């Protein structure tokens, strides 16, 4: 068996047992990258030299017994909106095409302390704005199951890299479904933790009240181990929460007897593909057969989530992206005689069309004549959505739903119709608006051989219940394969 067939936790155990080495694992991954990267475009930046150097140092620490954690020695890919000291960090945007941070994000630092080897930075929708990974300035990432299709977004490079075996696990960020939806499209596990669980320090912001960093992995066990490592209280992030229940691997228990699972009727109405509906409901049946109590219920306000989300996220983006002006770092337009001309040209040439669209939308909803009509109204809807979830979690331990209305669409199908792209987030964005944890894991394939994702949603700080439920389903489902050569 090749080390590429092992999960992250299995690989680390194999290294500690002397069956393989960190260097061998890194070289094996880079061989896979050389085989598949030209057709997939998962990475913006690769750092083979740095990875091999880290591998040597980490191997010595493992041999000396200094690194004993479940991820020690395991190669990881990092989404390109997470700062990595000395390694290009572009947000897949021309405007940051030459930006090399002088510091690393807290999540990356935590992984490095645990013995992770950074392979490189993964492709994404520009500034995490998109659902297909086609808005990248460095070209689209393609789905490893079928390269005519998108991998989802915005963490499409991370999801595709995990699914293709181009890394053992990856970090992504989730503002409205950007971990869970690509995980569903690529047939991997993706988790968005409760807001505040993982420090946002070093994450280049899109929507600060919605952004959260999380893992993409091959299975639930890896997901729990990664989340345990990256979760920490951080004084550098004022929204970081101090928790004493981050031993997430303790929730890897195959038992859902008596657990109450709610299925929101609102998520199974018009617009949901029949194959997706059938596979998700079949997964619910599996959990019911294992002893869970499964009931349908009404979760109101779902239809208002998309307009509320795109109002709030765009407003925050328009503010956050004001800092990219070509003055201190990033792309600067040439031949500008006046300062205002340099600002205008740098931003006009540096940002792509989707980013410009959201900046303009955000500026509009924050303008004096429309602030109350749009932005304040969206904040009220956000509060009502949180209240609706609170009422649901008074009755249920976990909510079970689809992750996306369809399987992965074809490349180019969403670019000409942004509304269609926005609607693909309909089942994920409410989780971000309410600050809740959610996990996506594969529950089958459609007739075209594309993965279907099951979404489980939990109450705030109840990641353990999600992990337990997901793990129990995964044990019944069996191992889900890596994507072989697409098409």
Question: Where are each of the predicted segments found?
Answer:
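Short alpha-helical scaffolding segments that buttress acidic/His motifs in well-ordered protein cores
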Residues: 25-29, 308-309, 355-363
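Residue-level signal for inorganic ion chemistry
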Residues: 29, 51, 104, 223, ...
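Structural helix-boundary/capping segments
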Residues: 35, 164-270, 281-293, 360-390, ...
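An N-terminal boundary/leader segment
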Residues: 1-52, 289-290, 482-487
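Short helix-loop capping/hinge segments that flank enzyme active sites or metal/cofactor-binding pockets
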Residues: 71-91, 250, 255-262, 315-386, ...
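Serine-dependent amide/ester hydrolase catalytic core
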Residues: 12-13, 269, 301-302, 325-433, ...
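Short glycine/serine-rich loop/turn segments
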Residues: 71-213, 264-266, 315, 401-419
